[in-house]
Amino acid sequence: MKISANSIRTGNILVCNNDLWVVSKTPEHTQPGKGGAYVQVEMKNLKTGIKRNDRFSSSDYLEKAELEQKDYQFLYFEGNDLILMDTKHFDQINVPKGILEEKLPFLTENMIVKVEFYNEKPLNIELPPTVILEISETDPVIKGATATASYKPAVLENGIKVKVPQYLAIGEKIVVKTDDITYVERAK
């Protein structure tokens, strides 16, 4: 399926020179004073792991890989693999940890994820858009800090660092976006 260069998003898998490339960073849309607008895209080769930056004209069309998507439940880690179970047929598959890279700490036991297959081979795992995590380290609460929009660093139970509002304390649960690792709100 062809998509416009302006439609490229993080996580898209593109076919370039007969290889599969995953968009690993949010594409930058640029319109210089001279010349046409372009999109700067950082991609990673799924076979070799090599990263590269490409610049596409806004009018270019690229081939997006046709992927089959299925729901799987994360069960456990086994060596360098994730063990996932199909939620419909209860079949188990092994998927290399490397597919998730920096998102691996967000994976929790029994989490439902979407696994994308290309020619029946698992290529990508999509996590839920948000997860609820507990704050394990942060500075003490400052009285009267609810009116300000300032943030302080916090370490979550999975070791990820995120900026949180001043009024949050250790032990509180928060909602975090998995795509850009940012604080959303206090968990209800």
From Swiss-Prot:
One example of a Gene Ontology biological process annotation: peptide biosynthetic process
Keywords, in A-Z order: Cytoplasm, Elongation factor, Protein biosynthesis
Database matches in InterPro entries: Elong-fact-P_C, NA-bd_OB-fold, Rib_uL2_dom2, Transl_elong_fac_P/YeiP, Transl_elong_KOW-like, Transl_elong_P/YeiP_cen, Transl_elong_P/YeiP_CS, Transl_elongation_fac_P
GO molecular function: translation elongation factor activity
Pathway note: Protein biosynthesis; polypeptide chain elongation
Function: Involved in peptide bond synthesis. Stimulates efficient translation and peptide-bond synthesis on native or reconstituted 70S ribosomes in vitro. Probably functions indirectly by altering the affinity of the ribosome for aminoacyl-tRNA, thus increasing their reactivity as acceptors for peptidyl transferase.
Family per similarity comment: Belongs to the elongation factor P family.
NCBIfam families given in the database record: efp, PRK00529.1
Protein name (database record): Elongation factor P
